[in-house]
Amino acid sequence: MAILIKNKVPTTLYQVYDNEGKLMDPNHKITLSNEQLKHAFYLMNLSRIMDKKMLVWQRAGKMLNFAPNLGEEALQVGMGMGLNENDWFCPTFRSGALMLYRGVKPEQLLLYWNGNENGSKIEAKYKTLPINITIGAQYSHAAGLGYMLHYKKLPNVAVTMIGDGGTAEGEFYEAMNIASIHKWNSVFCINNNQFAISTRTKLESAVSDLSTKAIAVNIPRIRVDGNDLIASYEAMHEAANYARSGNGPVLIEFFSWRQGPHTTSDDPSIYRTKEEEAEAMKSDPVKRLRNFLFDRGILTPQQEEEMVAKIEQEVQAAYEVMVSKTPVTLDEVFDYNYEKLTPDLARQKAEAKKYFKD
């Protein structure tokens, strides 16, 4: 398989199966096992059911504002499947499905989005940084970790993603440029869900093919159907192997559709039509993978029903953990990262204690 593009020819959108779950090329060799595919389907459903329940809880005042992953489950789980356990992931705020794949527990994501810093205490073995809200900063994190891996001659990569709107940020270019110059072990990804909050791609970028932004920094690129789990896996697998082999970074654009709001404070009905949404849902990633699994006899409707019931219980249990956790103390907010506070942080801590006491 060779899907990396290294020159200025038009980028083709890489796909493995269509909306009905049929292979685009009947001779295409699937390298994932049936168990891996079923596990991927489980995680995609876990992410989706969590998001739907979180939306209900948030509307009922039982959770704070959050960014749903609806419609982007396949690209995130596919990314995770293409990585090794010792590869690093630098999340953005819409990375829930991939974080679940990496081993982060559902209750940690719920805690994070409910304002409890315990949600950011991710075990070191998962090689996953805390969620990053500042758009673009995660690209610098992935470049820096890629530098570390390159410097130590480790056969691993650092991976991150950004939304289509985030490609207008300076750090998007700066991180790729320095990683390209020094051939660091980084894989940069774009989750092109076609909306930067309410702004369409054509109003935020002069090119509709965002993967071509790789040309300016002289790195190879892949443009992949982000609603196709297997295509997303194969794209990440190839890009990661390229970067871990000392060839330098790769840029992957996952073309998708954001089904839900940007965050729960957003109303998509203001800037897109029901007809657009209905058309986009024909390529729903969960439905497409279900069709693929059913068509090949890997999963049955009864097995799916049992899976969903199990997930419903798992998510409810995670919610119960979330509500049982008390918020962290002010001391812990400041003391968690440092053995000894810097003078600036010590001053800020004293100011915070006075403020909250008053």
UniProtKB/Swiss-Prot annotation:
It catalyses: N(6)-[(R)-lipoyl]-L-lysyl-[protein] + pyruvate + H(+) = N(6)-[(R)-S(8)-acetyldihydrolipoyl]-L-lysyl-[protein] + CO2. Keywords: Oxidoreductase, Pyruvate, Thiamine pyrophosphate. The keyword 4Fe-4S does not apply. Its EC number is 1.2.4.1. GO terms for biological process: branched-chain amino acid catabolic process. The pyruvate dehydrogenase complex catalyzes the overall conversion of pyruvate to acetyl-CoA and CO(2). It contains multiple copies of three enzymatic components: pyruvate dehydrogenase (E1), dihydrolipoamide acetyltransferase (E2) and lipoamide dehydrogenase (E3). Heterodimer of an alpha and a beta chain. This is Pyruvate dehydrogenase E1 component subunit alpha. It comes from Mycoplasma pneumoniae (strain ATCC 29342 / M129 / Subtype 1) (Mycoplasmoides pneumoniae).
